Regions:
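Predominantly the C-terminal beta-signal and adjacent terminal strand-loop region
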Residues: 196-271
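Extracellular loop and loop/strand-boundary signature of outer-membrane beta-barrel proteins
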Residues: 43-52, 85-97, 139-149, 188-204, ...
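Outer-membrane pore/translocation modules
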Residues: 83-159, 252
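Short glycine/proline- and aromatic-enriched beta-strand/turn motifs that initiate or cap beta-hairpins
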Residues: 21-90, 268-270
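Short loop/turn motifs that connect adjacent beta-strands in outer-membrane beta-barrel proteins
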Residues: 21-31, 66-74, 111-121, 165-172, ...
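Detector for outer-membrane/organellar transmembrane beta-barrel domains
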Residues: 129-201
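Transmembrane beta-strands of outer-membrane beta-barrel pores
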Residues: 39-45, 78-86, 111, 127-133, ...
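Residues that define the transmembrane beta-barrel architecture of outer-membrane proteins
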Residues: 31, 52-60, 72, 82, ...
């Protein structure tokens, strides 16, 4: 038994103390892939109209990272979320198919700090695109007709990842992010509510998003909470002339200020 221990020690010394290194988790950004599953609660509000949409959501996401070896890295991630929503406003409406996807390309840089136990700060930025489809067309409980709506955001993510060792095999990764809205495009299919109404496209130029997540990683698995928030201001106004019973009317439509919050739990596998 003693000879086996001596032999193992010699092998470690010959390999340049790699035995000790193998048991220690790496906190710098690494090349690899991650698949994730999320379960969350979602709420969308238009305060001025007292409109609210609530939904439990299930999502899947993928992230691919390439580290260049000189502290720079690039990352691409994609996320798809689906759920069944409830509308409260002009009456109520349930079991609304509700989904969105989010695509992003990012570039960042690792700053390593050996003091305070050792940690990495990795600021990043890039470009993001979010598409949401609200399949709400149909009558509400009050008899009012609702309509389908799609939402497009092009945004600039600016954030930082904080990564630290918990012990030799576990680490904690926390991400803080601010999303600057470059342009939002809202398409409202008003013709579903009434045949004399036109479909309307509105543009949004003022708004922002916030993201916070914290993932505890052990081996290839990680788990943790996340929160996403959007705050979007009034869109531009679009005016159309509509004809009802032979009479012409001017219809001005805009997308009201709104906010969205989603909070949930994520489980991920890295490979």
């Amino acid at each position: 038994m003693r000879k086996s221990k001596v032999l193992a020690l010699l092998l470690c010394l010959i390999s340049g103390y790699s035995c000790a290194q193998d048991s220690s988790v790496t906190i710098t950004t690494q090349t690899g892939n991650t698949l994730g599953l999320t379960i969350s609660g979602y709420q969308y509000k238009e305060p001025s109209l007292d409109v609210k949409i609530d939904a439990p959501l299930v999502g899947v996401d993928y992230a691919g990272t390439y580290a260049f070896g000189n502290d720079w890295f690039v990352k691409a991630d994609a996320r798809y979320v689906y759920g069944s929503a409830k509308y409260t406003g002009s009456g109520t409406q349930s079991n609304i198919p509700y989904s969105y996807y989010d695509l992003r390309g990012l570039v960042g840089y690792d700053f390593s700090f050996s003091k305070l136990g050792g940690f990495v700060l990795a600021p990043f930025t890039g470009i993001g695109y979010r598409y949401l489809f609200d399949n709400q067309g149909g009558p509400t409980s009050s008899g009012a007709n609702s309509y389908n709506r799609s939402s497009n955001y092009v945004y600039l993510p600016i954030g930082v990842t904080h990564r630290m060792k918990v012990n030799d095999t576990h680490k904690l990764e926390t991400v803080f992010e601010y999303d600057y809205l470059i342009q939002g495009t809202q398409v409202s299919h008003l013709s579903q509510a009434a045949p004399y109404l036109p479909d309307v496209t509105n543009q949004q130029f003022r708004g922002y998003g916030l993201r916070l997540s914290s993932m505890y990683q052990f081996s290839e698995w990680s788990v943790g909470p996340y929160v996403t928030y959007w705050n979007i201001q009034n869109s531009n106004a679009v005016t159309n002339v509509i004809t009802v019973n032979g009479n012409n009317y001017r219809l001005t439509a805009y997308e009201p200020a709104n906010n969205t919050i989603e909070a949930g739990i994520k489980v991920a596998y890295s490979f």
